[in-house]
Amino acid sequence: MSIGRRLTASFAGIALTALAACDGVTGVGSRVEPALIIFYRDSSTIVAPDTVSRGEAFTVRIKTFGGGCTREAVRADVAIAGTLAEIRPFNRTQNANACTADLLFLYHTVQVRFDVGGRTVLRVMGEQRGASTGGTNGPALVERAIVVR
């Protein structure tokens, strides 16, 4: 075998080993969890217009909390019933032995449309962490009222 082929084979072996060891690249060893929407004294923000038109879609942007092993916003499920839109954001957390000690904001953007007029509610449902929950998360919700004309 020539030196070039040996080097190529060696580099290929190193690359495969590195990829197999890196869960962040392959997505193996991670879990999708309800997003953290209350972090101690801070709550997620829901950015949406104050007033919208009936039957027209509008954009809603939700700030969630991440950091450490949670570094990616994955999806947000939306369910609309009458004057209530429930939004459930989810983030990806890597399974790791060590994670960074930082706080990140992870943003979720969804489209919402109400077919009824009047006062409506955007309800974001997720998890909270704080003094009352200790080191574990508990259920949480944050709401914002808007007017549909």
Q: What is the predicted function of each stretch?
A:
Residues 54-60:
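Structural beta-strand segments of beta-rich domains
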Residues 47-52:
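Short beta-strand segments of immunoglobulin-like
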Residues 60-67:
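Aromatic/hydrophobic beta-strand junction motif of beta-rich domains
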Residues 88-114:
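An anionic, turn-rich surface loop/hairpin at beta-sheet edges
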Residues 16-41:
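Bacterial Sec-dependent N-terminal signal peptides
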Residues 55, 116-121:
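Short tyrosine-centred short linear motifs in exposed loops/low-complexity segments
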Residues 1-23:
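Sec-dependent bacterial lipoprotein signal peptides
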Residues 127-141:
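Short acidic/polar inter-strand loop motif in beta-rich domains
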